[in-house]
């Protein structure tokens, strides 16, 4: 494996902070050999040396269990441990000479962020890598909100959520190494590349060009490209990359001279050494420049740049100022620019041209060779010019199109000063003496302007690709804002403080980036594979309690002179009551937890709050990290608690424990983050998180954040951590490296080609032995990376234990996993790529495009929420001067929707809330934040004041004035989560299995429990699905697996009885294919009754809550014990009694008894992360999966893991799983597990064909479309049913006699007409309207309204009518039309939403009618049409254009059937005006009203410019004017 040269050898690798002088080499060499000589098996755990308390003495490593510190001076003379391993094993290599670089000075970064100078940096630290014997739990990690059953709860998760007990934090520091790269090899490879510059315009040449040159241009340089070292092959930090040469060699005199100055790093390097495992080595001498071409270009632009034979040595380039000046023009370090083939990329030279097959043929060369003597040279030259011009024109067109797309991608919804957003259009790599590797990125901005960005150490180690988005946060130390490096300004000696963020539109949490420091692979796997199995953790629960106790205590102290222990105990008791259930499921007593908090935290919190939460900093001495100094710092105010900040500038997000105002020396106030930790461990990830919080605050408030405060509740004092430029750079490097694994979430993947799923390399460290995701990591290593025991780094035999089960069918397993993992990734790209729209579109643009946003808002009123303590209702209205604003009802935001509130200056997610009400002029949002805008800018004084959200003293009038210093936007919170749960479900097929019933002891709680099959991999499903093992059934002559007897008076038909018998004889699984209306729910309820009567436990699950509840409603009159998991407001009122109430649970045994005695547990497929599934003593005997044909295979695998046998019920002739990505759909993701098993093993299927829903005519349609006459009516009564009209004569009163049209409404409502296609081809006024992706048809909406009005006036109840459409824009229009009390009970849904439901009468609006006869793509899916038709019981009315709908080939024969049966009713020209119903016009007007007259403004007409792109409003105005 790249970067993992060791084989089962371990060393105690070290991370050191720079400090003092270089000393003798021999000592550390001997120590390294001693370490290497140790055996792999460790007899004693390593102890953790104290931090910030180490002296730089010459201390050798002893064999004691505690590894003592080694002086930094000794460590500096060592090479990396893995190089020593090679040296020892081969006994041929010598350690490289060390190098000490001159000390750098630190400078402030930019207006966005100020960084502290060297005096606040740490002194000397030596930290040993170790593997703790017991799990070392962090006190604060972020739980995944995705797939949470209650979406509301995940909108504002705590920064200290409960984390599964088995997930443990392992402190480890990476020390990854790759073999040295041979620079000569790079030069040789580049020399083989034929590359030429292409001019911007091709004109007649003065002389004949070589035909090879022309062919090369035509073919697009189809030569072998030099390879760029993959990032996975690089070390964990750029500092230690051995294949890239370092700065100039330092001679002995310079070393002696610099001994007194220490290392060159700026400020605090304790974090940097952990991030980078820093080392220095002697650089090879180099006299030539190596230029690498880009090999990673995805599309469009590609630059060709080659090496001239006459390339001159640039060893003389030493002047950094000269280098910087050259870089500004994009021509830095080019060889002999007048004569070199490597020239600067022109605007039109960045597209890769793939020639056709004929251009690749040699026939053109042969032809030219044969005719060369017969044709005049100028004729050949003219012909060649024509070819070149043709190619050039094609290139220019393609390039312009690509560049336009890139420029669009580079636009930002809210540009910021000092932040530049660019898209890479081409790139190249250059090897320079005394500089090392340099990459030159040709970029384009949102205005279409191109520029060059020069990237050096450390940013050069990122794998840039064409099309990547970068943010440059401009600093102030270097004049060239397009140079990203560690170089110093030669005049001021200040370090380059420009920062780079790669793929900034993916936001990573501070916790994720912090954990990546120890192991990048582990962090990536946790994010991409969400394991729903978790165990309760007392440590996490305790951390939550202590966090909230400290936060409450701080808030109390702000308004009181002192806090007493009595107050703390009072607050603690309240918190213990809140967390009582969490404590109980940890098998602990509440009193014990209280004593623990009082013993280990309460006294410290009391001392800390009384001493440090004070207006004055007198006596509040705070230690400064990395130094022996202290500084008076107090917390004079608290700005916010649990502040949630999203930063699309830095590509980061996080919850801050507290944002505080710190009073430092000379009463200078600073806004800084206060990070609270409650555990015993001291992890470098805490420092990473804290520094990330400084960046987040810098983005939110646009002020310098110079440090952060860290407080451990087990201590009485806090520590100040200065914000250091070098540390910030490497934290962003870690974040940027993570982003490369999630690029698919930014752009939708369209191609069907399978992409490679790459992971960071194995850490191969001692911490791997106790890693909580070791099984997943090694299985993936085997499936994706052809892993071997030697490369795993695990103790001997362990890799085989974890992966040997894959050997029996490894090739098939690899193919299966790779295929479906790729399909999940493609689908994930389509789901998540829309997330960035929130950041990249300004509010008005997003509102006009999609309606998912309301823009230009101001606060009109703020009131406290009457029902929810600590909540407020913010009322928003449009700006007063905005006369052109649309009605808020025109948006897609509705009551009870979750929304995100941001300001229009680029500060996103100020808070999240739920819509309380919305009307044309106002919208009310319930939030838990008192102030939205607490940033007050005095432009005259140039001072920014930050108001406290916790203790705001503003009056109502001042509050609103303060809030309206900015304008707001409200976005519908449809941020899509990744498919990490589905990806883990797929992986679980290949994890090692666990034998059930084995006694195991939990290492933390010491409790003994028996294993369950669900604790390991899903071996049974793997054999059935991947190995294609056929399911087994008991023979009809044998007794069934589950003995049963049906009652004599049962109403079940023969089909249903056969289906039940199939289930009871199944040894693995059974499938029930239930056609529409055939009683699937009844059969499932009967099966549950039989299984429970035989003592079996059942897990009932489906994709939707309604499907689960429909089955439970049929069981409500039984004595079966049922537990319905889910939030009450999502559960049907009739089944809410089954939602568990744990108030009666007083102990851990009470809880176990309650869940283990429950016969039926019901939940959705995505609700399987409940703690019940972990604490269950046994898995379920049966899992019943309803709606199985609508669930994609990876999602269905989740609940099936928890049962010994399973039953799937569905109909794959109805709606398939919803798949957004076309490539994923065509690749097979749309094929459900139900359909797969139906087709592979039809003997496992029981069909239900007798239906009791639809009349005979409607069944005819369904049989014609799908079922080939298999579907039958259950009895004659069902066959002959019709829609009854109690008062049909009422319609005559509403006829418009002036209209010549016949009384079409009475005709189509005639009860004998059970299927009607209402064809309006003769009505010219009815035509579709298309606005971007929104397709509506107002004429059809009016016809639908008249049909509903006609039925209501004829006596048909609203509850018996359903309105359906296939288009969501039409759905919104219909809902607005019927938004009146008189239509209560009328359901208006899409075909997908109507699945599983039925009505006596269904009206379908087909929408499409246009002159092009384009019927659209939705009708091509016959399964969707089938669902639409089969929702009706006794009457089906289809409103559409026969000519347009009939143009769809897939549906043409269906239209012909309607004509043959005389079911098409063609309307007359003026049919729209035949009836006039009461309040009809008012309903339409209110639904469509998008604007009204404004006082003092010119009236808007249908010819106004304002409505030119608003066809709905334009049509309304035309109706008014007519």
UniProtKB/Swiss-Prot annotation:
Listed name of the protein: DNA replication ATP-dependent helicase/nuclease DNA2
Biased composition (Polar residues): 91-100, 287-308
Sequence positions that bind ATP: 1074-1081
Region Nuclease activity, annotated ranges: 450-900
Superkingdom, taxonomy of origin: Eukaryota
CC cofactor: [4Fe-4S] cluster
Result, substituting residue 237 to A: Abolishes phosphorylation by CDK1, leading to a poor recruitment at double-strand. break (DSB) sites following DNA damage
Main localization category: nucleus
């Amino acid at each position: 494996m790249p970067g993992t040269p060791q084989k089962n050898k371990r060393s105690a690798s070290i991370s050191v902070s720079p400090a003092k002088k270089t000393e003798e080499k021999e000592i550390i060499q001997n120590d390294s050999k001693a370490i290497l000589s140790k055996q792999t098996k460790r007899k004693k755990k390593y102890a953790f040396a104290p931090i910030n308390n180490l002296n730089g003495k010459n201390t050798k490593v002893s064999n004691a269990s505690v590894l003592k510190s080694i002086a930094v001076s000794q460590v500096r003379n060592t090479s990396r441990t893995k190089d020593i391993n090679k040296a020892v094993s081969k006994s041929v290599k010598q350690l490289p000479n060390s190098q000490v670089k001159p000390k750098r000075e630190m400078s402030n970064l930019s207006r966005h962020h100020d960084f502290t100078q060297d005096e606040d940096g740490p002194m000397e630290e030596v930290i040993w890598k170790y593997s703790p014997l017991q799990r070392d739990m962090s006190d604060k990690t972020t739980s995944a909100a995705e797939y949470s059953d209650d979406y509301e709860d995940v909108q504002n998760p705590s920064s200290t959520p409960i984390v599964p007990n088995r997930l443990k934090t392992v402190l480890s520091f990476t020390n990854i190494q790759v073999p040295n790269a041979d620079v000569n090899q790079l030069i040789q490879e580049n020399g083989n590349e034929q590359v030429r510059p292409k001019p911007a315009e091709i004109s007649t040449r003065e002389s004949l060009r070589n035909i090879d040159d022309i062919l090369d241009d035509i073919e697009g340089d189809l030569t072998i490209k030099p390879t760029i070292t993959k990032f996975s092959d690089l070390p964990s930090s750029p500092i230690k990359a051995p294949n890239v040469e370092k700065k100039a060699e330092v001679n002995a005199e310079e070393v002696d001279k610099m001994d007194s100055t220490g290392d060159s790093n700026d400020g605090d390097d304790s974090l940097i050494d952990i991030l980078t495992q820093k080392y220095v080595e002697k650089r090879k001498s180099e006299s030539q420049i190596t230029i690498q071409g880009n090999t990673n270009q995805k599309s469009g632009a590609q630059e060709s740049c080659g090496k001239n034979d006459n390339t001159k040595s640039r060893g003389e380039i030493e002047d950094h100022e000269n280098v910087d000046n050259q870089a500004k023009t994009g021509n830095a370090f080019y060889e002999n620019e007048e004569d070199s083939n490597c020239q600067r990329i022109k605007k039109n030279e960045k597209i890769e041209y793939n020639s056709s097959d004929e251009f690749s043929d040699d026939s053109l060369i042969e032809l030219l060779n044969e005719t060369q003597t017969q044709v005049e040279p100028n004729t050949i030259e003219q012909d060649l010019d024509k070819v070149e011009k043709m190619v050039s024109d094609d290139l220019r067109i393609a390039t312009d199109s690509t560049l336009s797309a890139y420029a669009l991608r580079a636009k930002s919804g809210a540009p910021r000063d000092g932040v530049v957003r660019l898209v890479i259009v081409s790139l190249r790599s250059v090897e320079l003496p005394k500089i090392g590797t340099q990459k030159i990125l040709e970029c384009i901005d949102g205005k279409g302007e191109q520029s060059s960005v020069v990237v050096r150490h450390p940013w050069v180690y990122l794998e840039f690709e064409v099309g990547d988005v970068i943010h440059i946060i401009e600093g102030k130390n270097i004049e060239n804002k397009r140079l990203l490096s560690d170089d110093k300004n030669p005049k001021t000696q200040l370090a380059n403080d420009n920062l780079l963020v790669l793929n900034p539109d993916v936001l990573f949490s501070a916790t994720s980036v912090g954990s990546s420091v120890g192991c990048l692979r582990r962090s990536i796997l946790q994010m991409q594979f969400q394991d729903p199995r978790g165990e309760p953790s007392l440590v996490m629960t305790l951390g939550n309690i202590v966090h909230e106790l400290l936060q409450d205590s701080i808030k109390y102290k702000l308004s009181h002179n002192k806090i007493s222990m009595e107050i703390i105990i009072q607050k603690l008791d309240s918190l213990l009551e809140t967390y009582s259930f969490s404590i109980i499921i940890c098998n602990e007593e509440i009193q014990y937890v209280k004593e623990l908090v009082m013993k280990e935290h309460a006294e410290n919190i009391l001392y800390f709050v009384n001493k440090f939460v004070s207006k004055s900093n007198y006596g509040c001495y705070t230690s400064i990290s990395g130094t022996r100094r202290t500084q008076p710092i107090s917390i004079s105010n608290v700005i916010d608690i649990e502040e949630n900040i999203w930063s699309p500038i830095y590509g980061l997000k996080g919850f801050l424990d507290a944002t505080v105002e710190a009073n430092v020396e000379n009463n200078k106030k600073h806004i800084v983050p206060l990070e609270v930790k409650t555990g015993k461990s001291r992890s470098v990830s805490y420092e990473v998180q804290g520094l990330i919080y400084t960046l987040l605050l810098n983005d939110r408030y646009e002020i310098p954040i110079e440090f952060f405060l860290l407080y451990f509740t087990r201590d009485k004092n806090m520590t100040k951590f200065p914000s250091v430029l070098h540390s910030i750079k490497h934290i962003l490097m870690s974040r940027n490296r993570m982003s490369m694994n999630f690029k698919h979430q930014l752009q939708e993947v369209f191609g069907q080609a399978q992409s490679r799923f790459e992971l960071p390399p194995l850490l191969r460290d001692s911490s791997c032995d106790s890693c909580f995701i070791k099984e997943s990591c090694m299985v993936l290593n085997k499936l994706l990376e052809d892993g071997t025991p030697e490369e795993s780094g695990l103790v001997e035999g362990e890799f085989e234990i974890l992966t040997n089960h894959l050997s029996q069918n490894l090739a098939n397993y690899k193919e299966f996993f790779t295929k479906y993992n790729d399909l999940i990734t493609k689908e994930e790209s389509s789901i998540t790529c829309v997330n960035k729209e929130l950041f990249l579109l300004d509010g008005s643009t997003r509102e006009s495009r999609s309606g998912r946003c309301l823009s230009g808002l101001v606060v009109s009123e703020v009131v406290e929420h009457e029902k929810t303590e600590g909540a407020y209702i913010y009322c928003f209205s449009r700006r007063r001067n905005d006369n052109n604003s649309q009605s808020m009802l025109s948006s897609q935001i509705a009551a009870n929707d979750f929304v995100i509130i941001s300001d229009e200056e680029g500060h996103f997610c100020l808070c999240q809330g739920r819509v309380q009400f919305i009307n044309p002029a106002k919208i009310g949002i319930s939030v838990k934040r008192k102030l939205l805008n607490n940033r007050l800018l005095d432009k005259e004084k140039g001072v920014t004041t930050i108001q406290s959200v916790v203790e705001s003293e503003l009056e109502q009038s001042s509050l609103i004035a303060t809030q309206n210093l900015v304008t707001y936007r409200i976005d519908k919170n449809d941020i899509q989560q990744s498919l990490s749960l589905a990806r883990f479900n797929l992986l679980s097929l290949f994890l090692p299995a666990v034998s059930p019933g084995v006694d195991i002891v939990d290492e933390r709680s010491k409790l003994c429990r028996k294993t369950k099959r669900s604790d390991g991999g899903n071996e049974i499903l793997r054999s059935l699905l991947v190995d294609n093992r056929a399911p087994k059934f008991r023979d009809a002559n044998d007794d069934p697996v589950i003995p049963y007897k049906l009652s004599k008076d049962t109403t079940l038909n023969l089909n249903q009885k056969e289906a039940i018998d199939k289930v009871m004889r199944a040894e693995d699984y059974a499938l029930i294919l239930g056609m529409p209306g055939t009683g699937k729910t009844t059969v499932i309820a009967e099966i549950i009754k039989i299984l429970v009567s035989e003592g079996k436990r059942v897990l009932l699950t489906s994709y939707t809550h309604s499907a689960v509840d429909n089955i439970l409603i049929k069981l409500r009159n039984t004595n079966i014990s049922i537990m319905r998991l889910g939030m009450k407001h999502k559960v049907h009122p009739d089944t809410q009694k089954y939602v568990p109430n744990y108030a009666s649970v007083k102990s851990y045994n009470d809880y176990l008894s309650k869940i283990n005695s429950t016969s039926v547990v019901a939940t959705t497929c995505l609700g399987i992360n409940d703690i019940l599934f972990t604490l269950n003593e046994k898995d379920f005997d049966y899992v019943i999966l309803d709606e199985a044909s609508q669930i994609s295979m990876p999602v269905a695998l989740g609940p099936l893991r928890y049962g010994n046998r399973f039953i799937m019920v569905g109909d794959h002739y109805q709606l398939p799983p919803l798949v957004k990505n076309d490539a994923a759909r065509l690749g097979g993701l749309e094929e459900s597990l139900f359909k797969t098993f139906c087709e592979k093993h039809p003997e496992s299927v029981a069909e239900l064909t007798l239906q009791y829903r639809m009349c005979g005519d409607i069944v005819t349609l369904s049989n014609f479309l799908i079922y080939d006459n298999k579907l039958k009516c259950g009895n004659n009564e069902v066959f002959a049913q019709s829609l009854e009209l109690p008062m049909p004569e009422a319609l005559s009163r509403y006829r418009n006699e002036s209209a010549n049209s016949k009384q079409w409404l009475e005709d189509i409502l005639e009860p004998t007409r059970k299927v009607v296609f209402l064809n309006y081809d003769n009505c010219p006024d009815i035509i579709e309207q298309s606005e971007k992706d929104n397709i509506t048809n107002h004429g059809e909406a009016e016809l639908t309204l008249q049909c509903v009005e006609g039925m209501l006036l004829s006596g048909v109840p609203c509850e018996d009518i359903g309105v359906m459409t296939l288009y969501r824009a039409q759905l919104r229009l219909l809902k607005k039309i019927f938004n009146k009390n008189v239509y209560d009970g009328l359901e208006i849904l899409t075909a997908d939403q109507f699945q599983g439901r039925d009505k006596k009468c269904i009206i379908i609006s087909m929408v499409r009618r246009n002159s092009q006869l384009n019927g659209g793509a939705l009708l091509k899916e016959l399964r969707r049409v089938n669902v639409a038709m089969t929702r009706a019981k006794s009457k089906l009315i289809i409103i559409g254009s026969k000519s347009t709908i009939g143009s769809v080939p897939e549906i043409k024969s269906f239209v012909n059937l309607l004509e043959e049966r005389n079911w098409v009713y063609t309307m007359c020209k003026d049919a729209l005006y035949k009836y006039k119903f009461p309040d009809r016009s008012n309903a339409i007007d209110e639904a469509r009203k998008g604007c009204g007259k404004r006082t003092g403004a010119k009236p808007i007409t249908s010819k106004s410019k304002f409505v030119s792109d608003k066809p709905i409003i334009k049509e309304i105005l035309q109706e008014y004017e007519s």
